[in-house]
Amino acid sequence: MTDPTKRRMIGSTVPAKVREYYNQGHQCLLQEDWEMSVLFFSRALHLDPKLVDFYVFRAEAFIQLCDFSSALQNLRRAYSYDPGNNKYLNRLAFVLYLQGQCLYELCDFQEALCVFLQASDLQPQNASFSYRCMACLLALKRYHDCLALITREVKQGRASADVYILRARLYNFFQKAKLCYQDLRSALLLDPLHAQAKGLLQKMVDQAKQSLQDASTLAVQGKVHRALKCINCAIENNPLDPNFFFFRGTLRRRLQQFDHAVEDFLKAMDMVTDTQDNLVKQAQRQLLLTYNDFAVHCYNHGAYQEGVLLLNKAIRDEQNEKGLYINRGDCFFQLGNLAFAEADYKQALALSPLDEGANLRMGVLQEKLGFCQQKHRQFQTAEEHFSEAIRHSPQKPQYYLHRAKCRQFLQNTLGARLDVATVLLVNPEYPKMAAVMNTLFPSMTVENVLKSQVAELAKLQLSRMIENGPKNIYPQSTVVQRLLERRKAQVLVKLWKQERLGTPEEEVTLYQAPQLAEEKKVKTARRRTSLTDSYADQTSSGSVFSIVSISTSGPEMSTSQEYKSSSHTAIEFSESTLLKPQLSVPRKSQELTWSPKVVQAVTENLIQNATEVTPAYGQRDSKKATQVPKPKKTEDPKDPSQSTSTTEAPEGPRPSKSRSTLSVKERIRRAKAVRAQGWKLKAQRSSQKVTKTPSLTHSTTHSDIGESANDTPGQTPWPSKAADSLSFSEISSTDLSSSESFLELTNLLTQEVQQIPGDREKLTSDD
């Protein structure tokens, strides 16, 4: 049993000893006697373990002795007794930092990392601990862990310029140039004068230029995929250069990556500055080409509606590109919107009238429109569509065959024959011609048809249509029109000056035979073209073909008279198919030279008077040129050689007619014949060959085509309506003077224009 007195003495002496150890330890701290200080504080804590301050004092002594582990143990013990004291926590974190830094300097990066991580856990808001952890991870080459730690710091909003630069270097190491560039931009925003950021940025720009050069080389070599990888690397190193996106867009367009190509071009256009107008134009052009190629891709895969939408975008920005209209017209054609397709093809032809592809497509479209109208029995409209197709593609025989069938329904037999003859001219072995040949040319072979006069006329029309081509269908540009007008004015001035100087002219009359015209060309060393020639050359034959008055000799007669339609078919004469009027004037009578207006009036007058109605087969023509009818003898033809009408001029003198009894047409012909006789006498004098022989003219006029004047052997045929006109060789030049004939002709032209409607009505009533 313990003495109570002794217990009381022990209890009173323990606090005194603790106080004594405390004073001695504190004195040693002041004297920097770290070991004795640790000894005294340890004795005091042995007497009373709950003295928290003594742990802190002993930890300070251990810190000075660089015994960080012991210091950490004492600080943790103190913090465990008083968790709310932040001073203990801050001191503990500081000791951990010192320990980690010492380990880092000793290259013990793994232990240093563990220490820094402990300090960072104690004070997460302290960025210095995280930075030291990053350094340890980099030293350990744990780049992914370091990048994750940096990303965590950036997300927490504690990133600085150094942090961005550190992560940029990591991205550059991982070849993530795009992210590297972004971090450099962020670092420069925080510190515009950061030297390391500027240096690294310049390095990336140089890498981008090198990648662009490599991509260009590979693209030229045809290695498009590798070139695309290089240009992607260039964009990652310098994503603010619009040239890189433009180049990548072109590569993607070649690889048919149209969506990405459009994005690149749009991005390049957004990134350009005011000084890069050329790049903007190139990007717009490439964007249009991308839309067009994308539309073609959709067209090939049957997505016609999508192709139309893409081409609408392209045409909205570029209205002068014919290829866009052609492609959109193809899409409309496949969708069945023929009206829209026709409008697009017309627009393309207006931009380029000679474009072969546009003309070919227009021909196919017009053919389909013609089939649609023909199906609805609208043969007149179908004929117009087929004629339009022929104007665009005159060498396609199927168009002529389709139009010939339409003209058969319209009872235009002559036009159908011309079309069939044209088909044989273009392709003599064209299939499916037997039925049409039997209908329009019965009992005739292909060779006979090709030798006929209808074939000659069809050949003439075909050659003119091919020569003219589609260039006259659509209006020319303003510049071309002005150039043509200027040249025409220069030619007119030159001709006017030559007329003032008295330059002789040798011209051929309206109804002179082609053989005589060729002989005159051989005799004439230098021939001058009249002003009306240019007008006649510019006319192009339309859907209604015309007939030329072709004179034949002897056995060569027109085969078009052997087969006649049972209906009344209107036969029209066009100015383009008539022989060109050329009138000669001697030098002594220059004041009587016909002006171009008079010549043109004569031509138009004759064209209007040339329209006649072909009677039915076997019927008699009842038309009358004068009040007294002319007797005729007609019989049914026995063979094709007897079906032609021959007009002969009588050898004996003709009974003279007064001017009052002559009709208007006969008076015009007579006046022209007088002038032609004067020209002929002049030609005979120059050649010094005066011969007088009775002329026998065989001419096929517009009235002869529509009638059947066949004579039996042994009978003399009555003169036809064409024979009633005066022959050039039988009229004396003394009947009318040149001046009187010219004035009379001028007056008659004026009267004829006014009397033509009445005469036509009169003829119609007589029929």
From Swiss-Prot:
Keywords: Repeat, TPR repeat. It comes from Mus musculus. Pfam families: TPR_8. Residues 612-733 are annotated as: Disordered. The keyword Repeat applies. InterPro entries: TPR-like_helical_dom_sf, TPR_rpt. The keyword Transmembrane does not apply. This is Tetratricopeptide repeat protein 16.
